[in-house]
Amino acid sequence: MSKFKIAVVLYTYDRTDDAKVNMDIITSLWQSSKIFSSIKIVHAFNGQRNWYPKKYKEDDLIRLKNPGHFQGASELIDAGIKKIQDKYKDVDYVVVLAPDTWLVKLNYLENIFKKMAKDELYLATCAWDKPDWKNIFEVGMAVDFFVFDFKWAKKYKMFPTNYKQFYDKYSDLFLYFRGSNVSLEKLIFSHYIRGILKQYNDNNGLKHLSLEKMLRLTDREPIHKDTKWTRQMYWPKMGLLTHHDIKPKKALLVKVKNIKGESIKKLLASKNVDYFNKH
């Protein structure tokens, strides 16, 4: 089996200690995998400079201004992917991660890439759903963790998302028809669907083809455990930790083998974790 060249886009506003631990996980645990020939980390950051004054373990650090939640995340993701397109053209797959989204079960991660390569799938993600609303075409996809085929996405222009351009043009319609904001989860998924349409030119079978060429990570569904959009934070089968509170995260991290790094060491050794993500 050929090895994969992957790149990680880590996008951060204020969860800087989460981002550092995430990089420790990637450069120790992920890097130990025999199926990756290289892992590049592109860190896109739009917080204040004094929150994150210098690089940690990323290959590239991109600094942007923060225009707000959805647009900010969109611009960070777009900037990270643009850097990969310009600098790491031979990458096979890109992993997009929020800083507080840690994946610590290596075999689960490896199986995602093996399945995508074997079945020629272009996207791995799950629905941003809740128990009574599971249609991914309506709720969109998780954007705190997803994987995509880099060359396919580049060919069919899945990125940039250009959230601001879309928002400026259509936000009033969203408020008028749905009473809701423009969702980044839906916008990125719509760009994936558009790529499928460009490739196959089949309107009638578009939804079927979109699902057929996607690895749906149903182990994470539903992401929200009730109809009030209360988030689940831990998926043991995946080894996926997304807590905002560091204390339960730390308790789980203690049990993970083959991870190391300065930020992990500091976290596990600290009796008081009040320093974490504090600015």
Regions found by a protein language model. Name each.
Residues F4-I6, L29-V42, D59:
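Short loop->beta transition adjacent to catalytic acidic/histidine clusters or analogous donor-positioning motifs
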Residues I6-D18:
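A conserved hydrophobic helix/loop-capping motif in glycosyltransferases and polysaccharide synthases
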Residues R15-A19, H69-I77, K105, F189:
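Phosphate/oxyanion-binding active-site loops and adjacent basic polyanion-contact surfaces
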Residues R15-S32:
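Short, well-formed alpha-helical segments that are part of the catalytic scaffolds
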Residues H43-D90:
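Active-site-proximal specificity loops/subdomain of glycosyltransferases
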Residues V91-W102:
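Short beta-strand-to-loop acidic/aromatic patch adjacent to the donor-nucleotide binding site
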Residues W102-H191, G195-K198:
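Conserved catalytic core of nucleotide-sugar-dependent glycosyltransferases
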Residues D168-H279:
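C-terminal catalytic/acceptor-binding lobe
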